[in-house]
Amino acid sequence: MQAARFVVSGVVQGVWYRASTRERAVALGLVGHARNQTDGSVEVVAAGSAAALGALEAWLWQGPPAATVEAVTRTPCAVPPTEDFVTG
C-alpha cells in the first residue's frame, strides 16, 4: 500500500470538493481524508494502490463541476491510520 498527500488549490471550498473527493476515493478503494485548510486549499491524504492514487490525482485536477482547480501538489506520506475515507 502506498500513500500520498495532495494539496489542491483554487476555488475548492464551498463547492462540494471534499464530498466529491470522498466519493471518488471510496470508488477507487482508497482510505484517508479530505480536509479544508485555512488558506482556502483542500488537503487530501490517501492510501491504496499506485494505480488508484494515480486515478485520484487525475480526478483531483477536475473536481466537481463548481470547482476551479489551479494546482495539485503531491508528496509521499505515511499511510493514514484509518480504514475509511472521511471528510473533516
Swiss-Prot record:
**Which Gene3D superfamilies does the entry link to?**
3.30.70.100
Top EC class per UniProt?
Answer: hydrolase
Keyword Hydrolase tagged: yes
Keywords noted in UniProt = Hydrolase
EC annotation from Swiss-Prot or TrEMBL: 3.6.1.7
Mitochondrion is among the record's keywords = no
Active site: residue positions: 18, 36
Residues in Acylphosphatase-like domain copies: 3-88
Which PANTHER family does this chain map to? ACYLPHOSPHATASE
Protein's UniProt name: Acylphosphatase
